[in-house]
């Protein structure tokens, strides 16, 4: 919506200003409500046996922040103009709060991904497991410190302050920040997937033709053909790469296609929408696969310290067919 000068403001425009504000507030409320429901759905359908990692803590913290944002927008929309502790809150603060959250979300992609990658790498590399209580406390403090650091940067950065003040006089116009971090992160992951598939596309096709589904401990499982000399510890990255690709795309292919579409059409999504729990779990699976591939010589499924993906059972990449002694009612289903 285009901003108008004060001398062009007529009585007719002022009469139409309130319905426009109400419509914009309701639209923002519905968007945040849909995002909150999507976050709750993903947190409910995740695997229950997943270990608590740094990314898990951040996903829950993001869902909590989205819920608090929804509550604040609801209060500001309902009461419209009120005073708390001498501070007057109006519809303008809906836009201000949304912009601050957008900037905060937009700058979180790189720190969260870097910390999660370090967390998974350390879990694979260390010889002794840290106390679960102290590890959870460390995760909690790291998440809190990350949120506070990014929020403090947003509030003290001069360029962001100028951007926030630029639209202070126009409560009907509230531009949202579009994160460049998510753009480059998504582009990088898609390029890595494309190169990995290009390198091992023949193995991927052969693997899909030989892969079968069976009932294992009352659960459906995928089994890949392994050479007889393969055990629990893998040292061949070439053999592991196609299995990681199949497992990853088997779960996240719709999300990969969505990312390709967004980048191809150059769709600009506000940061307060783009940073969500499904996106974080998608990045989480990619990071786990990357850490597995780089540390394939250290992998041992009998070690419970291995990171567990909430949506992908990576064990089907490592367990050889000839070791499966507990297969119940094998199904003659071949995926081609």
Swiss-Prot record:
Residues 42-56, 117-136, 208-243, 294-336 are cytoplasmic. Its main location: membrane. Glycans are attached at residue 8. GO terms for molecular function: G protein-coupled receptor activity. The chain crosses the membrane at residues 21-41, 57-77, 96-116, 137-157, 187-207, 244-264, 273-293. It comes from the Eukaryota. It is a multi-pass membrane protein. Keywords: Cell membrane, G-protein coupled receptor, Glycoprotein, Membrane, Receptor, Transducer, Transmembrane, Transmembrane helix. It is found in: Cell membrane. InterPro entries: GPCR_Rhodpsn_7TM (IPR017452), GPR160 (IPR042353). Residues 1-20, 78-95, 158-186, 265-272 are extracellular. Gene3D superfamilies: Rhodopsin 7-helix transmembrane proteins. One of its GO terms (cellular component) is receptor complex. Belongs to the G-protein coupled receptor 1 family. Orphan receptor. This is Probable G-protein coupled receptor 160.
């Amino acid at each position: 919506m285009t901003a108008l000068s004060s001398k062009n403001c007529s009585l007719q425009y002022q009469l139409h200003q309130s319905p426009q504000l109400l419509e914009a507030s309701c639209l923002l409320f519905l968007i945040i409500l849909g995002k909150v429901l999507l976050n709750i759905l993903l947190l409910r359908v995740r695997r229950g046996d997943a270990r608590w990692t740094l990314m898990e803590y951040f996903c829950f913290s993001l869902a909590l922040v989205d819920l608090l944002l929804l509550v604040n927008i609801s209060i500001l929309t309902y009461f419209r103009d009120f005073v708390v502790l001498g501070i007057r809150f109006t519809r303008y603060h809906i836009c201000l709060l949304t912009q601050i959250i957008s900037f905060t979300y937009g700058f979180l992609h790189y720190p969260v991904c870097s910390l999660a990658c370090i967390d998974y790498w350390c879990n694979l590399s260390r010889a002794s497991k840290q106390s679960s209580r102290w590890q959870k406390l460390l995760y909690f403090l790291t998440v809190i410190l990350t949120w506070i650091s990014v929020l403090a940067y947003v509030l003290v950065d001069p360029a962001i302050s100028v951007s926030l003040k630029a639209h202070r006089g126009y409560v009907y116009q509230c531009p949202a920040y579009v994160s460049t971090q998510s753009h480059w992160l998504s582009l990088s992951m898609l390029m890595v997937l494309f190169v990995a598939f290009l390198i091992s596309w023949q193995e991927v096709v052969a693997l899909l033709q030989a892969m079968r589904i069976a009932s294992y401990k009352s659960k459906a499982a995928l089994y890949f053909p392994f050479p007889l000399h393969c055990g629990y510890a893998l040292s061949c990255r070439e053999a592991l790469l196609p299995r990681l690709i199949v497992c990853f795309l088997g779960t996240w292919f719709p999300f990969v296609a969505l990312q390709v579409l967004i980048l191809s059409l150059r769709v600009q999504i506000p940061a307060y929408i783009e940073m969500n729990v499904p996106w974080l779990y998608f990045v989480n699976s990619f990071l786990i696969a990357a850490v597995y591939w780089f540390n394939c010589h250290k992998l041992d499924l009998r070690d419970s310290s291995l990171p567990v993906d909430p949506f992908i059972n990576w064990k089907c990449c490592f367990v050889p067919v000839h070791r499966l002694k507990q297969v119940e009612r094998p199904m003659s289903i071949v995926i081609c």
